[in-house]
Amino acid sequence: MKMENFEYELKMAIEHILETNYPRKAFWHFDDLIDDLKSGIKAGDDAVVIKNMVINMEGPYPLKLGAKTALIHTACDVVAMGAEPKFALNAIQAKNEDEIKLAVDGLRKQSIGLNIPIIGGNTQTVEELKSCISVAVFGELIDENLIIKDGGAKDGDLLIMLGDPVEGDVGERIYKAKKKFDTYLEILENGIKINACKDASRGGWLGNLLEMLIKAKKGAEIKSLPYPRATRYLGTYIIAVPEEEYEKVVDIALKNKCPVVLFGRILEKPKLIIGTKEYISENKMLELIKKFPYKY
């Protein structure tokens, strides 16, 4: 990857994580109205946690893409926070009955493959509107005292990438996602300590790693490139794990035939180093931290 291309991707990654600043500030105090809220708009995490329930909503996706991945992607964030998905709702806007069938058949395949029943939602046909799909997934923490947040990385943690890129036809996507979900939940069920986890979705591994670092007020040293295009959608998990727990993670990943790649380490000082080059200085990272209204 040429340096100028990577620096362009870095700029795009920063712009991506800035997109949610206004809505987060606008809805900031709504958290205070909800009893038993453990993680909401102030945390800005992948999903909302109320008591032991974890909820995430995604979309709208273009209809054909959503038919292949909407439920998969929405469930991904629920699992990342340490929850098992239990059921889902969907909303479909289609232009005609053929599009409704395309959307429903694709969502049904995802639902059966992941064992996440779709139990309700809304379907409409308005020709003037673009065809799209949105999904909400409701999950339950596997341990009500354990929430894996995306901003919990600690100095010295190893950075790993877990899972295959979620791409291909709907069957391939289901297979890859389920293997990743099962492996990750098994890691947690075995008491292996995970300090932070985030789905490398829109924004790629770079954008999502930057958000993790900003929230944790930490830096990272990247020693290998899990995927050369840094802002590509992957659907893998970026995980910060204590070094002494890493081999246990590898053991479970090997048993489940789930890819795991070690690609860096968390630093106490907030900066981003890739190879020998410092791409984000400590001063620049501190400026980014000040711009984001996250509260853990």
Swiss-Prot record:
Transmembrane segments: none annotated. It comes from the Archaea. GO terms for molecular function: thiamine-phosphate kinase activity. SUPFAM superfamilies: PurM C-terminal domain-like, PurM N-terminal domain-like. Pfam families: AIRS, AIRS_C. GO terms for biological process: thiamine biosynthetic process. InterPro entries: PurM-like_C_dom (IPR010918), PurM-like_C_sf (IPR036676), PurM-like_N (IPR016188), PurM-like_N_sf (IPR036921), ThiL-like (IPR006283), UCP036541_AIR (IPR011414). PANTHER family: THIAMINE-MONOPHOSPHATE KINASE (PTHR30270:SF3). To Synechocystis PCC 6803 sll0787 and M.jannaschii MJ0640. This is Uncharacterized protein MJ0799. It comes from Methanocaldococcus jannaschii (strain ATCC 43067 / DSM 2661 / JAL-1 / JCM 10045 / NBRC 100440) (Methanococcus jannaschii).
